[in-house]
Amino acid sequence: MKRIRNACELCRRKKLRCNGELTCQNCMVYGEECRYVKRVKHDNRAAVQENERYPILYTPLSTSDHDNDEENEINELKNAVKALDKRFDNFELKLEALFSLLRSQQDSERKVKPGGFPSLVSQILSAGALVDSKLQAYTMRTNFFSNGFSSNDLFPHSFPTWKSAFRDVPDKDWAKTCLDWYFRFINCNWPIFYKKQYMESFEKLYIDKNLVKGAWIVSFYAILALAVSRDKRVDNSKLAESFFATSWFLIQRPGFFLTPQLEKIQALVIMIQFASHLSLYNLCKKLCGQVCLMVKDLNLHKESTDKDLDQDMAELHRRIFWVCYIFETTTSLIFGTPPVLGDLEIECKYPDINYAHCFAENVQGDLIFTCEISLTVLKHEIRTKLYNSNNVFLDKGQKGVISNIQTKILNFERAIPSEMKHYFEILKAGNGLPEELDIIKQHFFTACVEIYLSYCNTLIYLYLADDSIEGSKICLSTARAAIDVIKGFLVVLDPISKNICYLWLFLYCPFTPFLTVFSHLLEDDDLDADICVKDVDRLYSIHAFFLKMKDISGEFAERLSVITENFIQSAEQYLALQNTSVFGTFDALSESFSI
């Protein structure tokens, strides 16, 4: 089959790539006659037949040209071999450098804690791996999570449905009672609404629904859900979920997430709080993501440059940002997801306590709010500077970072308001409440307990990254103190435990001190028998806490209670193998322990 240098008429007409054959492939496909306008002159038919794949006429080379070409080819081949050898040498050097870097990183990781921040799932997996490593020596169970373990095993995936939504406007007096409760006990600690402005919109709702914005309606039903959920009567749980389903349905309408608005952020924050009550932590994560996008679009993380913005609105912007910052940062810590708001260049002032009375009658809530901001900022700094997997700190550099954060923690301790310091001393003493507390003081004391536990977790995160013996001691003593507070106040005292924040998992993950004490039990071979029994008792306290939290966090808390119970049984099994004299004490302890 002959090849032609020019394209055939069909290929030219249809602008196709012609293969120059007769008949060409395109003409065969279209069933057309293949014709070339300019035929190649076949003057040297023998040459064409000898090399018919090439249409250029063949001209024999002279002997001298042939020798020169051969010499050039040999030189090019030698140069290519030399270049290849050089590339192999460079490749070997790079491989050696990579292996050297890997070895140095492995040596560093023996001194420095692992790069990833201890999220809840990673903590549970670490505890399971520790059990496996300890029981392997006794040829016992070697795979604690035989079927694997992930966040899907912890967090429910159900979502609200429109079928259960509350489709009417509730009674005005009843709704006002719910709003008063919200501003009295929730908005004081998480200030995102000016009470006066919100109640003005509430009055408009019962005059004409068209006078209020759709985002306000979302927050209204979400607040009703929060208020009703705190009522411990069983028949009200469905009503609370019905109000929340209404909010959920309203944000599904087209366009809600397309345009950022301050009112939408406020509504989503309330929904995040109630989603925590339903253990819908995956929903919390998704809502936090949408909140972050709106916060960045509205530049709430920066002080406004708008001269026309009054001080009241500027203060509202600050408080909304810091509430979102706490929610998003603590959520990312628990899930182990990258932070969003924490990595922004934050130029936002702390809340002004002079505005506290505008958000709630109880101004003490501002003390709680400001302390939680400071602790969240510290947790984020610990995460980014000590647990960043991309950085392997040298000992000197790591100690410098730890020392710097220690200074900031000391400054935080000195800045704690006197009202809270008094309660902190009570928590450390562990002797129970010295006086009767009214409802307002009970809420404030519960919030102080949660701030103290958040403070303890901050210390644990810091000293987990410290390889020194002193750091390990501080980490263990802090974990024991945190568990003692949980046992003495949140498990035993019902008036205090009933006020626990729905966001307890994000603010202070109780599994963090649990894992610290649990690891010490299994890793310390010289542990005193009396101390060992006390530590096991502490582990049972965390188990009891999760059982108690079933009323607040439902299915999620129940799953955590099962996980901690399995870990405690494994610890008792291992310790019994190590020291049979202690085993009888464990049996008596597990039988007598009750919540």
Swiss-Prot record:
Residues 8-34 bind DNA. Keywords: DNA-binding, Membrane, Metal-binding, Nucleus, Transcription, Transcription regulation, Transmembrane, Transmembrane helix, Zinc. GO terms for molecular function: DNA-binding transcription factor activity, RNA polymerase II-specific; RNA polymerase II cis-regulatory region sequence-specific DNA binding; sequence-specific DNA binding; zinc ion binding. It is a single-pass membrane protein. The chain crosses the membrane at residues 209-229. It comes from the Eukaryota. GO terms for biological process: DNA-templated transcription; positive regulation of transcription by RNA polymerase II. It is found in: Nucleus membrane. PANTHER family: TRANSCRIPTION FACTOR PDR1, ZN(II)2CYS6 TRANSCRIPTION FACTOR (EUROFUNG). This is Uncharacterized transcriptional regulatory protein C1773.16c. It comes from Schizosaccharomyces pombe (strain 972 / ATCC 24843) (Fission yeast).
